[in-house]
Regions:
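N-terminal signal peptide c-region/cleavage motif recognized by signal peptidases
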Residues: 15-18
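N-terminal secretory/targeting leader peptides
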Residues: 22-114, 122-125, 129-332
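Bacterial N-terminal signal peptides that target proteins for export
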Residues: 1-10
Length: 332
C-alpha cells in the first residue's frame, strides 16, 4: 500500500511538474481583415478560449489588416515557421492544393446550412488532410459569407450586365475563368491594393461578402452593390506545421478545442453582420439590388463549362466525394 501511495504521489508530482514546465507560448495570428470584421471577432474568441484552457500559458497576438503582409506572404511565413497562425480565405490555398478550388465553384451551395455541411463534412476534412505536406495544419473553417459584386457603372441584374466590366478578383484560376465566362475582364490583384484601384478607376468593380464591402468602405468608391451570391466564401484557420510540431499533445488539444468552440460563435457573428451590412451599405448611399433566382440558375449554367473543366484537373477521388456530398446536402 505504501509503495502504491508513493507511486501515486510521484505521479501527481510529475503531472504538477509538467504543468509548471509548460512553457509560455506567444502565437502571432495574422489576417487581412480589419479589427471590426467577424474574422477578427473569431480570432479574439479563439484567443480567450485558448488562454482559459492553457491557464494563460498560450497567448495570441492578433495582427489584423495585412499587418504581417498579404495572404500569400503570410502563407509563406507560416510554411517557414516565422508566423504561427492565419485565417485566410480558402481561395488562397488553391495555389498549393488545387482541389481547394472546389470550394470556389460558382453557385455550388444555396445557403449557409449547405455550406456548413459541405465544409464540416468529409469533403472539408479531405481537403484539410492535404495541407500538412505543404507545411500547414488546419483547425477548421470560419464564415466569410456569400460573395457579391460591386461596381461603379451600374446594377448587375443579369449575366449580360457583367460584360466588359473590369472586375478585381482573387488571384485564383477558378475566379478568373468564371468571370471570363460572363465576358467580364477579371483583374487579379492583392486585397491591400484594391481600394486604391477602385478609387482611381483602374478597375470598375470587385466581389466580396457584404461585411468586407462595408468594413473596407468600398461604398465610398462603388455605387452599386448587387446580391449575386455567386460563391460561398470561407476562411480557414491555419497553423504553421513547424510551430504545431513543437507543441505538446495537450497544447495541440487545447488549440483544436479552442478553434472548434470559436467556430460556431464566429459563424453566428459573421452571418448577423452580413444581414446588417446590407442596410448599412444602403444608408451610406450604395444602390442595392437582388438577382432573381431564375437568373442565378441561368448564370450557373453559363459557368458550368468552367466547373467541368476544372473538375477534370483535380484528384478524381476528391471530385467524386465533392459531387456525392453536394447530392447529400442538397436533399430536401
Amino acid at each position: 500500500v505504501r509503495i502504491a501511495r508513493t507511486l501515486a504521489a510521484f505521479g501527481l508530482c510529475l503531472v504538477a511538474a509538467a504543468a509548471t514546465a509548460q512553457q509560455d507560448r506567444t502565437i502571432r495570428f495574422g489576417h487581412l481583415n480589419n479589427a471590426d470584421h467577424p474574422v477578427s471577432f473569431g480570432v479574439k474568441r479563439f484567443s480567450e478560449l485558448l488562454a482559459a484552457k492553457s491557464g494563460g500559458k498560450m497567448k495570441v497576438q492578433e495582427f489584423p489588416a495585412n499587418q504581417l503582409g498579404n495572404e500569400m506572404q503570410q502563407q509563406s511565413a507560416l510554411q517557414g515557421g516565422v508566423q504561427q497562425m492565419s485565417a485566410p480565405a480558402t481561395t488562397s490555398l488553391a495555389g498549393i492544393v488545387k482541389e481547394f478550388g472546389l470550394v470556389d465553384f460558382p453557385f455550388a451551395v444555396a445557403d449557409f446550412a449547405q455550406a456548413d455541411a459541405l465544409l464540416d463534412g468529409p469533403l472539408g476534412q479531405a481537403l484539410i488532410a492535404k495541407l500538412p505536406e505543404k507545411g500547414l495544419v488546419a483547425l477548421g473553417y470560419w464564415d466569410l459569407g456569400f460573395r457579391n459584386v460591386t461596381n461603379s457603372r451600374g446594377p448587375i441584374k443579369r449575366a449580360e450586365d457583367l460584360e466588359g466590366l473590369k472586375i478585381r478578383v482573387i488571384p485564383n484560376p477558378v475566379f478568373l475563368e468564371t468571370f471570363k465566362a460572363f465576358k467580364a475582364n477579371p483583374v487579379p490583384m492583392p486585397f491591400a491594393e484594391l481600394y486604391g484601384a477602385l478609387e482611381s478607376r483602374a478597375v470598375d468593380g470587385q466581389e466580396n461578402p457584404f461585411s468586407v464591402i462595408l468594413s473596407n468602405k468600398f461604398y465610398e468608391v462603388q455605387k452599386y452593390v448587387s446580391a449575386t451570391n455567386h460563391v460561398y466564401a470561407a476562411n480557414i484557420v491555419l497553423v504553421s506545421k513547424k510551430f504545431w510540431d513543437q507543441l505538446t499533445p495537450v497544447e495541440q488539444k487545447w488549440m483544436r478545442e479552442a478553434a472548434d468552440e470559436a467556430r460556431g460563435y464566429q459563424r453566428q457573428v459573421s452571418r448577423a453582420a452580413a444581414q446588417k451590412s446590407v442596410g448599412d451599405l444602403q444608408a451610406k448611399g450604395a444602390q442595392f439590388n437582388e438577382v432573381a433566382p431564375a437568373e442565378q440558375a441561368r448564370m450557373r449554367q453559363i459557368a458550368k463549362p468552367v466547373v467541368d473543366r476544372f473538375a477534370a484537373q483535380y484528384d478524381p477521388a476528391i471530385v467524386k466525394l465533392y459531387n456525392d456530398e453536394l447530392a447529400r446536402i442538397r436533399k430536401p
